[in-house]
Every structure is written in C-alpha cells, then in structure tokens.
Curated annotation (Swiss-Prot):
Organism of this sequence: Alkaliphilus metalliredigens (strain QYMF)
Family to which the UniProt record says this protein belongs: Belongs to the SfsA family.
UniProt xrefs under InterPro entries: SfsA, SfsA_C, SfsA_N
Stored NCBIfam families: sfsA
Protein name in the entry: Sugar fermentation stimulation protein homolog
Domain of life where this protein originates: Bacteria
Gene Ontology molecular function: DNA binding
C-alpha cells in the first residue's frame, strides 16, 4: 500500500497558520501562502521555524500555489494530508493486501449510510457489506503513542456512531486509524481532547465495530502503510 507524491516539491520554513486551511511559509526569501491539507490543529507540528515540504500547484481556480504536505519533526517526516488514508486503504483493498478483508472483491468510495458519508464500502460475492471509515492521525505523544483526534471532532464521532448502528443491523463496520509517521508503536483514542469520541469508540467496540491502526513509512517521494499497531 504505497502512494507516490507527485509534482514539484519544495522545502520551506513554517511561519504561522492563518486559519484552518491557510498558512504562511517562507521559501528562500519569499513569504508564500499555502493550502494546509488537514484541518486538525497539529500544534506540536506546525510551529514557527519548522521545516516543511510543499508541492507547487499551478491551477487557475486555486487561491494558493502551494500545498503543505509534510513536516520535518524530530528526525522524521510526518505527512499531514488528510486525504491519503482513504487512498491508501482503497489501494490496499483493491490489491487484497489487508488480510482481514481479502475476500471482498468490490470496493466503493464515498458511500452514504444514515446521515453520514463514509469513506469506503466492501462487497463480496455473497453480497455481504462492510462499511469502512479512515481517519488521518498525525499526533504522537510520549514518543510512541499515536492518538486521535487532536481537536474535537463531531464528524468523527458521528461516523463511529453510524458504524455502531450499522453493526446492530448485521452490517460489518470498521475504522482504520492511519498514523502518517513511522515512530508510533501504539494507538489510543484521545480522551483528553474529545471524551465524546472516546466514548463513541468504547460503545462501538462493545457493539462489534472493528478497529485497526497502522503507522506509515513517509519519505518525500512516497507514503506507505507499514506496521499494525496495538490499540488500547
């Protein structure tokens, strides 16, 4: 499960975050405005002076000419692009690289269930359905403990509760936490940041929703799902 990072990539120095979607980065002597590909807080990563990796984008409709893709943090690269977990899992399911789901031969994206649009759905020859939600994780605490979310997430809580209801209707449901850095060895929901999300996860586990977490190998050229992590 590997996604190559295409386009012209440029290093810069992070200056400040203007809002959830926009930041200022210094490239050489020039201050440029960049799109932040993740609405999470990422306060431990996006600090003034942090070295970051940008991608140049030349599209007329865009308000910015750069995407902020990665942050150099404590000797490693951290990918912040929140769209990549969906793409990585889609590739993994298509190529049958995830053993627990290798009997499913049809993969659909952006599937509506209840009041939510979930990331993926799998269907096998017996027409059994699995609903999948992917979560982008960038936060690692205590040197090795990955945690989600890094900001309160009503949307994430709603997705977990929708999957809980689906499982109660005999539909298989799973949440994948994709930690877009390689230093994580364990994962836990971030109760301190969002107790409602943690409670939703606890209830979902009791109902039978499946939870998986993986770290990733991240380079300037690609990101790949690596090791499965212990969840507690």
């Amino acid at each position: 499960m590997k996604i190559y990072i295409e386009g012209e990539k440029i290093r810069g120095t992070f200056q400040k975050r203007v809002n959830r979607f926009i930041a200022e980065v210094k490239v050489g002597s020039q201050l440029v405005v960049v799109h932040v590909a993740n609405t999470g807080r990422m306060k431990e990563l996006l600090t003034p002076g942090a070295e970051v990796l940008l991608r140049r984008v030349n599209e007329p409709h865009r308000k910015t000419n750069y995407d902020l893709l990665m942050v150099y943090h404590k000797g490693i690269l951290v990918s912040i692009d929140s769209k990549l977990p969906n793409r990585l899992l889609y590739q993994g399911f298509i190529n049958k690289e995830i053993v627990a789901f290798d009997k499913f031969n049809e993969v659909k994206r952006e599937v509506t269930y209840g009041k939510s649009r979930l990331d993926l759905a799998l269907i096998n020859e017996e027409k059994e359905l699995v609903l999948i939600e992917a979560k982008c994780v960038t936060l690692v605490k205590e040197g090795e403990l990955a945690s989600f979310p890094d900001a309160p997430t009503e949307r994430g809580t709603r997705h977990v509760r929708e999957l809980t209801e689906a499982v109660k209707q005999n539909i298989r449901g799973a949440v994948f936490f994709i930690v877009q850095r390689e230093d994580a060895v364990r994962f836990t929901p971030n109760k301190e940041m969002d107790p409602q999300f943690q409670q939703a996860v606890t209830e979902a586990k009791k109902a039978g929703v499946e939870f998986y977490a993986y770290n990733c190998i991240v380079t300037e050229d690609y990101i790949a799902i690596n090791d499965e992590l212990e969840i507690f």
